[in-house]
Curated annotation (Swiss-Prot):
Keywords: ATP-binding, Ion transport, Membrane, Nucleotide-binding, Transmembrane, Transmembrane helix, Transport, Vacuole. This is Organic cation/carnitine transporter 2. ATP binds at residues 190-197. Signal peptide: none annotated.
Amino acid sequence: MAEPTQPLLTDSNSSSPRSLDDTIESYIGSFGWAQFLQAALVSFSGVFDAQQTFISVFTDSEPTWHCTDSNSICHESISNICILPKTAWSWDYSPHVSVISEWGLQCAGSFVKGLPESSFFVGCLIGGLVLSTLADSSLGRKNMLFLSCLVMAISTMLTVFSPNIWVYAVLRFVNGFGRATIGTCALVLSTELVGKKWRGRVGIMSFFGFMLGFLSLPLMAYMNRGSSWRILYAWTSIPTIIYCVLVRFFVCESPRWLFVRGRREEAISILKRVASIPSTDVSSGGAISMSFSSLPFEEDEEKPSTNVNIFTTMKVLVEKRWALKRLSAVMAIAFGIGLVYYGMPLALSNLDFNIYLSAAFNALMDLPANLITLFLVDKLSRRNALIGFTALGGVSSVLIFALHNMRIGNHGALQLALELISYFSACSAFNMEMIYTIELFPTCVRNSAIAMARQALVLGGVFSPIMVAAGRKNAFWSFGLFGLAIGLLGLFAVGLPETRGSDLCDTMDEEECKDRRSKVAVNNVIA
């Protein structure tokens, strides 16, 4: 799997200095089994991330019911059980199958019913803002991933013992707070362990993990049908705790981050562990130390590395005009994607499909989205692919609204097909956007930039339930706005530079110089 690479010492007299990216790849190779196993283990966190993101679709749903007295006013045409006496109807299953039936919330307001899910997404937003910079500053990628998974696992287990809706909502908030940085850390850590040729493909691995987690939920929920919703939380918490142990003892920290933070000896030790090419220089470590000590940026970064404020990276992103422009664009695009990504599964109830099958179909859409992104990531420009996916998702969503207004017979199958296309487009656009964001920002702020993009995605998830509720009366407020948002906001990619095949930069100055060189090259071509 590894590609032969010449040792760095053979180029020691070269006039053109190597970047940290080239130097690391010269020693460990582009891709090897050690790097693959590391990336696979890190990417598996997406399984537990997805389970906690979508678990409320089943645990917080309103169960089906039936009339118990055929001679009373109760009959099948009545959709609101709150107008019926309690003796006239009964749940089809035990009241413990859902939080709605167990705590008697069937007649509560929409705010109370949606409080746990809203609390989860609010926790994701706050957790992303508070924790995102820690992976770039003090904790690093590995420790942040471990702590995030641990908080999520413990809060999931404690949720099993929730006595009421209020405690349940608080624990869901804590769960979202811990979960907020898992996807970001997994994506950055897995891609920083491999060479640039394989970076796009490895980035897709974390998305496959998320797909498996989403796909496992309908199966687990179906097996748990008729049983307590607490069992579903227990089933998802125990494997997460085991995974935390594996991360703590078997995952390596990013050598790129360690070098940028001035922790050279730790970085060299990790390089020797994950090296995919046989080399006496790698095994000894001496030549590596000499080569990395010659990198000019490391000397600048090493001094302040112990006094970095956790919000320094956010300040740097805002102060640099080019960085702020890029960050604003990727966040706007992510918000549009988030509306569709989280909104479409929630809106399935508006299409009146079986909850287990519809969720499974949506989870399966992640597979073609990941496969297509995997094969196109090295063939199409990041910018054009992102615009294309968002446009396709927008058109499909608007067509659902159009079909709804036509009121033709048997249009449910067409609506479902368009819904799946729209969700598939959102998944593909999300995959491409994350890879694009990795390449748009240097190492010193990369984790924070991706975290902000994911925050915008989650913000779309906060608004989507409100739009879905409004769409039950008028489909424009759900499917219509979903389509317009993702389609129009996707056009922000027009102003971003193309990054396919380019080297990853490590400092803001290095990225700025590369941007200036590309602009000069474009001007020369035009002239």
